[in-house]
C-alpha cells in the first residue's frame, strides 16, 4: 500500500461558491504548517488565510484537520475550503505541490485508501460512486443504504453461516469417532438449506438494487405486425423504429435508452418471431431470442384483433415455454382503439396484462407506471441496497457452489467435497466485500471514481 501524501480538488471543477482541496497522508500536517502557519485543532473548523511561500494570501477560508486513524481515509487529512473559482483552487493545489513528497491523487484514491485502511469495505466504497452518479431519488437512497453497510451486513452474515457450517463439516471429518453419521443426521442438511434460502433472498434484493442502479432491460417480443416497433416509439417518445403494415419490417435489434422519473430503462425492439425461409430475417429472429435470454422483463406484444385470449399460455404456448424459467412476462394487448377493450390491468397465470394502443397512445402511461414499479420506483427501501453487475455474478457463483455442495451431500454423502464447495462459496461471497479481491479488479473499480473521492 502506498504511503504517499496525496492532494486533489474534492469539489467539481469549474465555478462555484465553495471549492475544497483535500490532502491525505503523513505530510498533511506539513501542508497545514506551510499554508496556514500551524496545524488546526482536530475536528474544529478554523477560519484563516491560505498563504503562498512568500507569505502572501492566496485565499481565505475554512481549514479542517482530521487526525488519523479517525478520518475518512484512516490517515491524517487536511481540507482547505476556499472560494470556488477554478484559478484560486489551482493556485492552492500548486502551492501544496511545492511541498516535497506530495503528489496529485489518482481517481478514487482517497476512497481506495479508506478501503485499504479498513475504514469501509468494497461495497461501501462502490456506493460512494453510486451515490454521486445516482440519476433518481430511489438510486440515491439505495446507494446510501449500501454506504451505511446494509449490503455488507447481508453478505457478512452469509459468510459467517457458510464458514461455521464448513468448520463443522471439516471437524466432523477429522474426528469421525465423535460424529459417526454426521452427513445423514439432518443437521448439516438443515443448515445448508437455510443458507441457500438466505442467499436466494439476498440475490433477489441485489437484483432489484442492480436494476435501480443500472436500469432494467425490457425486450418487446411477439409475432410480426403485433405493434412492437410502435410500442418502442411510444415509450421512447420519438420515431426510433420504422413502422409499416408489412410483416417482418424489423429485422434487427433496435435499442432505446430512456429514463422514467430518473430511473434508467433499456428498451429492446426485436424482429417478429415466426418460421421463415428468409435468411436475413432468420438472423434477426436468432438475435431476438438472444436478447430475450438476457432480459430482465419481456413485454409479450399481442395483436388484440387476432385473439381474445389473455392467458399467455393460451395465446402462444410455444413462445412461453421457450422463455427462461425466471423471466417475468407482461402481456401487452395492442390495438385497444380497434377492439374497444377497457384499459384496465388484470393478472393471468402470474403475468400482468395491459391493454394499450401503441398507435394512439392509449394505456401507455399506465404501462410506464408498471415498468417503474418493476424497477422499484417509490417502493419501501427499508433494508434495500444498490448492487452492481459484479455483485450479481458473485452471488450467482456462490449459489452454484451451494447447489453443488447440496448434491455432494444428498447424492454422494461426500463430506470432503461438500467442504470444498463451501470454501468456494466463501471465496465468491468475499469477492463482494473485497476481502478476497484481485488488484486488477480494485484498480478497475477505483479508477472509475472522480478525482478527489
UniProtKB/Swiss-Prot annotation:
Its EC number is 3.6.-.-. GO terms for cellular component: cytosol. GTP binds at residues 225-230, 244-250, 269-272, 334-337. Its main location: cytoplasm. K(+) binds at residues 225, 244, 246, 249. One of its GO terms (molecular function) is metal ion binding. Residues 215-376 form the TrmE-type G domain. One of its GO terms (biological process) is tRNA wobble uridine modification. (6S)-5-formyl-5,6,7,8-tetrahydrofolate binds at residues 22, 79, 119, 453. InterPro entries: G_TrmE, GTP-bd, GTP-bd_TrmE_N, GTPase_MnmE, MnmE_dom2, MnmE_helical, P-loop_NTPase, Small_GTP-bd. Keywords: Cytoplasm, GTP-binding, Hydrolase, Magnesium, Metal-binding, Nucleotide-binding, Potassium, tRNA processing. Mg(2+) binds at residues 229, 250. Gene3D superfamilies: P-loop containing nucleotide triphosphate hydrolases (3.40.50.300), Probable tRNA modification gtpase trme, domain 1 (3.30.1360.120), tRNA modification GTPase MnmE domain 2 (1.20.120.430). It is found in: Cytoplasm. Binds 1 potassium ion per subunit. Its cofactor is K(+). Exhibits a very high intrinsic GTPase hydrolysis rate. Involved in the addition of a carboxymethylaminomethyl (cmnm) group at the wobble position (U34) of certain tRNAs, forming tRNA-cmnm(5)s(2)U34. Homodimer. Heterotetramer of two MnmE and two MnmG subunits. HAMAP family: GTPase_MnmE. Belongs to the TRAFAC class TrmE-Era-EngA-EngB-Septin-like GTPase superfamily. TrmE GTPase family. This is tRNA modification GTPase MnmE. The gene is mnmE.
